[in-house]
Amino acid sequence: MELSRRICLVRLWLLLLSFLLGFSAGSALNWREQEGKEVWDYVTVREDARMFWWLYYATNPCKNFSELPLVMWLQGGPGGSSTGFGNFEEIGPLDTRLKPRNTTWLQWASLLFVDNPVGTGFSYVNTTDAYAKDLDTVASDMMVLLKSFFDCHKEFQTVPFYIFSESYGGKMAAGISLELHKAIQQGTIKCNFSGVALGDSWISPVDSVLSWGPYLYSVSLLDNKGLAEVSDIAEQVLNAVNKGFYKEATQLWGKAEMIIEKNTDGVNFYNILTKSTPDTSMESSLEFFRSPLVRLCQRHVRHLQGDALSQLMNGPIKKKLKIIPDDVSWGAQSSSVFISMEEDFMKPVIDIVDTLLELGVNVTVYNGQLDLIVDTIGQESWVQKLKWPQLSRFNQLKWKALYTNPKSSETSAFVKSYENLAFYWILKAGHMVPADQGDMALKMMRLVTQQE
């Protein structure tokens, strides 16, 4: 046992040394790709539509990557980049300053970042008609990519494969998971699909919108008058959704957010304990005031590609990858990705989650305590609408407290799990759980992937 422990420590030291030696001082990025540690490529998913992916092999010093799961991370928006934000701001091996991240998931899983839908991050389209306009197209494109990936990387075909997601990425993950299950059953894709995790996910938009008023009122961010205003616009959103007027519902959703901003003095939709930091240059433009979609895009996509991250991705990272076309800039098409999905925003996918549960797919829902845009109350609301036969038994269970380590006395989360449904309440976290509570997010990932 002592010899094994020493070997692990030596391997870990060598691994950290190899990472550090790969960087020069300052912001320049000139590390050498380590054999078998990282690979990336494009896949043509449709005519005029190319999707970019980036794979990191797990770096656990005591285990081979084949002994650990493969996790695909899907960012939100739509239009948020997994290879950028998810990688360098949340779970990847390095942060935006290219410093090692202590809570990287790469210790316990190989990580596959995909810029999805097409037009996101380094993915791109050659014509405007090639942007995805609905979840069906998003899922179909991903099937093309996953088939290509698993066909080319057969070493991952038997490794447990999990899809983790965030925000709108969760809505896409639900649809992708269902299509992936079908493809596996039909034999068109070979992989060991083991579950999907929906993080602060836009599964039932109207349930989120309806919960905003009561949630903000309960934490003293709305008074009676403000609650009445928010509740009124939320009912208008509900009516539009019930009538199938999804584009109108999207416009009303944008209006609801403006009403909340005015009544809360600019609460941050991603963490209620902070205030939003608007882009004043954007807000001074005529387009910003005329278009609710532009305002929504400003709030829900542009914050995923701040100046530091954009400079990193379009500078050192683009130079490292070598395969990005000269005329493609990271994040340049993200606004078009967002706007193209306008009619899809407010459509619920509770039925898809229900189908996944019925098929026996492991489904995990996790949510940050301080999130507003997809608050926990709204998540709990749509979960209670599931037709899954085991829901009553799930509800009868008492949740269990979780701690980041055995010696900690501070509660970091709660979890409830029955058969193939689990729900995690992550404390002191906003919308981006791994960014806010990295240790707990890592522990949760290990629990979901059955490593704890």
From Swiss-Prot:
Residues 1-28 form the signal peptide. Keywords: Carboxypeptidase, Glycoprotein, Hydrolase, Protease, Secreted, Signal. GO terms for cellular component: extracellular region. Glycans are attached at residues 64, 102, 126, 192, 362. Induction: By retinoic acid. Coiled coil: none annotated. Its main location: secreted. Its EC number is 3.4.16.-. Transmembrane segments: none annotated. This is Retinoid-inducible serine carboxypeptidase. It comes from Rattus norvegicus.
